[in-house]
């Protein structure tokens, strides 16, 4: 993992693995922390490894105030495009679709939903109910409905009784305290790193399946809905019965691929602190 700083504006790119193309996200705010960017890059590396792609996760931060954001994001996009590193980036927090020029990978909510719902059903084939947090968009609701799942309305989704809980509001949204309050059978991330390391252990103890975000959110990396459903279902099917839970099982699966072409595995698994 290394940080490459831009010279044209106050921005940086966290790059997990060197000398390979990569995918990731760009976020913009007055101050983007490098630690969070590194965590996001690692999660994408594991997603790509899960798909057996020799690529790296990347995550960019553009530090800019509202009055200077337009110039900052334009300068960043122009500079990174000139690096000719093969990076493709989606618009994250503070960045609007269409602002990244030739770097941009369009955000595809339908592909995200396809993979996430497929993951949930692979882990819990008899699921009939689902609850979603406030980040759920129309695409996820449509995908759930198309698969015959009933949506549970709840003031607090984390404590709602349902087969599947879809959550992606923020990194670390489910800590160990929240994990002990969960009433769902399966937690399906729809965003990066929503479950902390301690929460994973508490979920295992409580009999809740915590699925790997780097698999459940990988649909957009595949470019086609049916391919996303098939691949995500297959991966979750491989790891759902792992002795240490599906998240650690998916980590081991990704690491087995990484070990086939890297001299040393990246240090640290993709989980929120």
Locate each region found by the language model.
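N-terminal ligand-binding/catalytic initiation module
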Residues: 1-108
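A general structural motif
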Residues: 165-172, 190-194
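Adenosine-phosphate binding glycine-rich loop
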Residues: 26, 185-273
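Glycine-rich phosphate/diphosphate-binding loop of Rossmann-like nucleotide-binding domains
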Residues: 107-166
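Flexible, glycine/charged-enriched surface loops at secondary-structure junctions
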Residues: 48-55, 86-92, 127-129, 152-154, ...
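Rossmann-fold NAD(P) dinucleotide-binding segment
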Residues: 171-187
């Amino acid at each position: 993992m290394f940080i490459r700083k831009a010279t044209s504006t106050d921005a940086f790119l966290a790059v997990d693995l060197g000398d390979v193309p990569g995918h990731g996200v760009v976020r913009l705010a007055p101050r983007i922390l490098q630690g969070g960017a590194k965590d996001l890059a690692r999660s994408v590396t594991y997603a790509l490894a899960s798909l057996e792609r020799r690529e790296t996760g990347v995550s960019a931060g553009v530090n800019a105030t509202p009055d200077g954001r337009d110039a900052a994001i334009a300068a960043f996009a122009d500079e990174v495009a000139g690096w000719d590193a093969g990076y493709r980036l989606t618009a994250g927090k503070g960045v609007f679709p269409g602002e990244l020029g030739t770097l941009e990978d369009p955000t595809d909510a339908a592909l995200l939903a396809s993979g996430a719902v497929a993951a949930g059903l692979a882990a819990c084939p008899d699921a009939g109910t689902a609850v979603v947090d406030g980040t759920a968009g129309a695409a996820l609701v449509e995908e759930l409905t198309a698969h015959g799942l009933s949506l549970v309305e709840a003031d607090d989704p984390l404590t709602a009784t349902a087969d599947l809980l879809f959550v992606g509001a923020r990194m670390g949204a489910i800590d160990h305290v929240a994990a002990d309050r969960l009433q769902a059978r399966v937690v399906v991330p729809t965003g990066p790193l929503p479950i902390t390391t301690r929460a994973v252990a508490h979920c295992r103890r409580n009999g809740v399946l915590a699925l790997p975000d780097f698999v459940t959110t990988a649909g957009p990396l595949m470019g086609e809905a049916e391919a996303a459903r098939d691949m995500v279902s297959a991966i979750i099917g491989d790891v759902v019965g792992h002795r240490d839970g599906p998240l650690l099982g998916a980590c081991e699966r990704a690491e087995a691929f990484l070990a086939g072409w890297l001299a040393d595995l990246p240090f640290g698994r993709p989980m929120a602190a």
